[in-house]
Each structure stands twice: as structure tokens, then as C-alpha cells.
Amino acid sequence: MLILAFESSAKAASVALCRDGELLSEYTQCTTLTHSRTLLPMGEDMLKNAELTLNDVDLIAVAHGPGSFTGIRIGVSMVKGLAWALDKPCVGVSTLEAMAWHGLSAGGLVCPVMDARRSQVYNALFSIENGRPVRLTEDRPISLDDLAQELGSYDWPAFLAGDGAEMSYDYLTKKGVDCVLAPENLRMQSAWGVAMAARDKEPGTADSLLPVYLRLSQAERERLERLEREAAEKKE
């Protein structure tokens, strides 16, 4: 199976091409350009250099969240459009599950962390069993205090990956948590991880592909807070 995978949940844009679990090509770009300008041209260029076309692709995969609200919307919308136009199956995978594939060489406990702001990280925990990540928790926003307490119950050191890894490492080590910071080449999100995670997912259609945000955006939170204030003022 030839999988074309996209990752746009954070600052870097990443595109990968995998056939039956083997990485054929991966492009990553981390610039000031928006994902809406870089993601699709990267994919088209990569396919061209591999002497392939979009019609050769069997499955289109994308990291559907959690992560940057804007980045996720761009990636999911683009893949929905491609899948619809080409009549191809597509699938969304957890950004955190995709990152867990970076911990294969470390083994033990893999702890992807993304900076969720508001004193929280997006996180899930995985163990490495038989050469693949096995989920231990659901994706969730969690405070570093709560994460430190949870990691303390495991016998393995936690392998930290993701754009929140360095921040989390500094905090967790001060709390006495046994953890390892992923090397820079394994720390950031990658489309290779998306492709690997997609192999076990049930393919869907463009209509079934949806973003996963885990919590409201800042604009939605502010709107809800404003409505609550207005409702309280009316009661007075």
C-alpha cells in the first residue's frame, strides 16, 4: 500500500511517502510560510521526484489533532479536498500517536507532549511492544503537575517527544521524574509517523474525516465567557 501522509499540527510542515511500511521519501519545512502555501506543493514535488502521481497513491493520511487549530484545519481540509477530487480513501490519525513512533528505539514508556498553553500540554502515553506503540492513555490536555504524578507510577523512564518536550523535560526532572529528552531529529512531529500510524486504521471517505481539537479554541472560549457574563448580568 502506498500512503501519502501530511503533518501540519505544529510549526513544521511535513509530508511523507511510504510503501508497505517502508519510507520512500519525507520532506519537512519549518519556515515563516503558512502551511496553506507549503503543504500541497511539498507533496506534489515529492511525488514528482519519486516518479509517481497522486493517482498512484492508495491512501491519504493526515494528523487530525490535537495541535495548532489553524494547522490542523489546513491539513484536514486539504486532505479532504484531495480525497474527494481523486476519489481516494483517507484517514486521520492522532498527532500524539504518530509521534509515539519516534520512540521505537527507546522502548519502554513513550510520552509525546505538545505545548497546549494555559499551563497544559497535549499528551498521551504509549508503551513499545513488538516494535510498535501501544496506547496506554487517551489523548488529553493535562497539567505538568498531573503528568508528573502519573509518570511517577511507572517503572520505566519516559521518552519525551514533541514541541513541548524540552519544556516538559525541564519541569519534570525538577520534580524528580525519570525521563529522557528525545534527540532533536526525533523530537518534532513527522509525516512518517502519521503514515505508520495510518496502516492500522480503517480508511474512510472525505466526508468522514474530521479534525480533533480536544478543547475549544481561544475565540470559542472567549465567546462562551462573554455569553456567560451577559447571562449573569441579565439575572441581576
Model-predicted regions and their roles:
Residues 16, 122-126, 212:
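Conserved hydrophobic/aromatic positions in well-ordered beta-strands
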Residues 46-50, 85, 103, 191-202:
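Stable alpha-helical structural segments in soluble proteins, enriched in small hydrophobic residues
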Residues 61-90, 95:
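DPxDG-like acidic metal-binding loop motif
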Residues 180-236:
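Acyltransferase
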Residues 22, 34, 89-188, 218, ...:
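Surface "functional belts" at beta-alpha junctions
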Residues 1-66, 141:
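N-terminal beta-alpha supersecondary unit
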Residues 30-38, 69, 73, 77, ...:
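Residues at secondary-structure transition points
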